[in-house]
UniProtKB/Swiss-Prot annotation:
Family: Belongs to the MotB family.
SUPFAM superfamilies: OmpA-like
Higher taxonomy: Bacteria, Pseudomonadati, Pseudomonadota, Gammaproteobacteria, Enterobacterales
UniProt name for this protein: Putative truncated flagellar export/assembly protein LafU
Gene3D superfamilies linked to this entry: OmpA-like domain
A GO cellular component annotation in the UniProt record: bacterial-type flagellum stator complex
Length: 211
């Protein structure tokens, strides 16, 4: 069956708009990366910073090195130089409409007791970073998610206790990536959970009818 000309035109328009949005997003993320790099250079933190543009957005890694730690060892207490960097970054992140995800990572050094472990530490450090960004003026609703990864995603897997594994990652999401995440968690509770409940109810009714 032939596709109506009007339908084809609408499809082309949608594709063109999508392409323009992707191009605009890539340009904005590139400019954001340049701004972040300038701030890190001025703070003499180039060695602590890595960035890459991925399909989901701009991935910003701020990590420890052998000379400086972002937090006191074994603690979520933030060090002054890292706090200064985050304060400088807050208005930069706020300059775009993009949502962000903040994730904490640790090395593989284990705690001596089970009361507090690397899961707690990585989560508390991510929350500390979020708090500094918000205190510096970044709106609370800019943060879409705060995550703890403990030592599950080591950058240097050959050296699990390496300083470079201790890091904070800030993902600046594209619009499509944040939309996907909203759908994944069922925004407003009616996009994922309710349809599934309705489907199960229908299956139960059909099962009863066939008995």
């Amino acid at each position: 069956m032939a596709v109506p000309e009007e339908t084809e035109k609408k499809a082309r328009d949608v594709n063109e708009k999508t392409a323009l949005l992707k191009k605009k997003s890539a340009t904005e993320l590139g400019e954001l990366a340049t701004s972040i790099n300038t701030i890190a250079r001025d703070a003499h933190m180039e060695a602590n910073l890595e960035m890459e543009i991925v399909p989901q957005g701009l991935r910003v890694l701020i990590k420890d090195d052998q000379n400086r730690n972002m937090f006191e060892r074994g603690s979520a207490k933030i060090m002054p130089f890292f706090k200064t960097l985050l304060v400088e970054l807050a208005p930069v992140f706020d300059s775009l409409d993009n949502k962000i995800i903040i994730t904490g990572h640790t090395d593989a050094m284990a705690y001596k007791n089970n009361i507090y472990n690397n899961w707690n530490l990585s989560g508390d450090r991510a929350l500390s970073a979020r708090r500094v960004l918000e205190e510096a003026g970044m709106p609370e609703d800019k943060v879409m998610q705060v995550s703890a990864m403990a030592d599950q995603m080591l950058l240097d897997s050959k050296n699990p206790q390496s300083a470079g594994n201790r890091r904070i990652e800030i993902m600046v999401l594209t619009k499509s990536a944040s939309d996907t995440l909203y759908q994944y968690f069922g925004q407003h509770g009616d996009k994922v959970v309710q349809p599934l409940v309705q489907k199960l109810d229908k299956q139960q009714v059909l099962s009863q009818r066939t008995r």
